[in-house]
């Protein structure tokens, strides 16, 4: 059985190491409001410092679309990293070129530099071979520790690997592959999967893949309204994808055939006048079964919370991807936060599968009580679907 080579498997003392991180953090006026992605990269960086490597950090921030824009600069990240590492992190105001090469040539063992945003060049997202070669020129070894962009074949996530050797994963990517891979493919059973969010079309391939592995699948969020239509229920003005009714019906049938429990919300919180921008909902009520005309479903109801919580408590492994309702609005967050609380308090291996679920569990205050939180959004979903991730497939394997 082969596995991806990790930084633990190589000697990088005195070597220049190009580390692709995911420092795509929220920045406003030079201030970082959530540094969890920076913190997630620290174990890999600290290991390389201790090994005496010369560490060249690379990342994107936002979508500058190939233009140099000050608001997308990684300078604030360099400052934050210096604080966390208790040592200087030199910020370079470009990511390729002679001045960058000259600065890198002056590095001593244990030094850390951060390159400017790779997406200031459109060649990054084009996976341009010439641009990848210029990035690779800076180093000898490639470490990918950016799981959040592993599903993208970009110059700094995949292209550089053609020019550097060895190519290995950092601790963050290693953990992601272990939890989203091994622990969902060979889980301690029963495995309960909770899927929420807005669109069935985004998650249908994941549902299909997980029907092969799960003992119970719970559906919440706006996705559940499309499944309600598939079961012949009315959903009022709730968000749905009528074109996905056939695939929803097929998923329900496949679950029955496989003996997988497939739980949909028996009741919902519905509102009359949802205004997301203002964070208001107007009149609200609970509907069991059908939602009446003029009402919009925004969260799961108390009976759903009870049903879903029971399934979570009976599990040994829980994978959660996607909120139960519009958790950003206080009136509609009870379902999501109740599920977060149940997962936190249950005796389970809990895996939070990226994106909005991580945001929701952070807001709920239970983040420190879960086993593992994925840093990937789209990457987590594609990996759970069984797709090959370009940023992982370029790495060396070891048997």
Task: Pin down the residues of each PLM region.
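Active-site loop-to-helix "anion-binding N-cap" substructures in soluble metabolic enzymes
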Residues: 1-399
